[in-house]
Every structure is written in C-alpha cells, then in structure tokens.
C-alpha cells in the first residue's frame, strides 16, 4: 500500500517535488521505474496512467474539490473505487446529487478527507456494479424523449 500522487498538470510535478522535500516526505517519480519503498509517495510524471492507478487503488481522493469547480470523480467509480471529494463539484453537477450522496464520500475539510481515506474500502465489484446501474438508469434519455414527442410531432405533420 502506498500513496500515489497524480498532479492534474505535469508542469506542476517540480512544485510537488519541492513541497514533499520540504515536508520531509520521501517520494519517487513514476518515470524512475523502480519499486515503491515503504513510506514513499509515488509522484506520477507521465500522462495516461490514472485509469490503471484507479484500477489498483483501494481508496481515492479527487483533487480540485476544495476549490471551486472540482475534478472528475466518475473515473474512480468506473474502476470500482469509492472516491472522496471536497465540497466543490460544480463542474460535475450534471451527474446528480443522488449519485453523489450515494456513491461519493464528501468531506468539508482536508482532515475529514484524510479520515475517509483510512476507512475500509467497499468491495470493488459492488461499487462498479452499483455505479454501472446508476449510469444505466440515466442513459437513453434522447430515445425516451423522442418516443414521447413522436405522437405530438406526427399530429402536427399529419393533422
């Protein structure tokens, strides 16, 4: 088990290196391609590895959610990982509050977020299946609307 840090923008990797060094936290870059030592933080410095990381994770904190906007918490859910987010998820409000209330741990402080990450992880297959069912319930909207509108449109075309 370890902590993996995936900066949203790779140009921020040096800033994370400086921050971890100042804090006395051992880390290594993903590009070093060596096993993670106990207590080390892995800092991702490559694109395209977040999905695989979620597939191996037990818990996930989705950054950018303690400031306005938020980031994509659907990615860990799709991999069967219950995500923890901060109070800001406006960019993903289209998902719906009921899905967030049921499948996302929302923390109001960084301390709450850290505590939630220490909780036992629910079974991956259960999270993945429940998320897939929630998404399926929200799909096919265009087809349903077309089905409802067809009689009305036909009555206008063929009065």
Q: What do these predicted regions represent?
A:
Residues 1-159:
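Nucleotide-activated sugar donor-binding and catalytic core shared by glycosyltransferases
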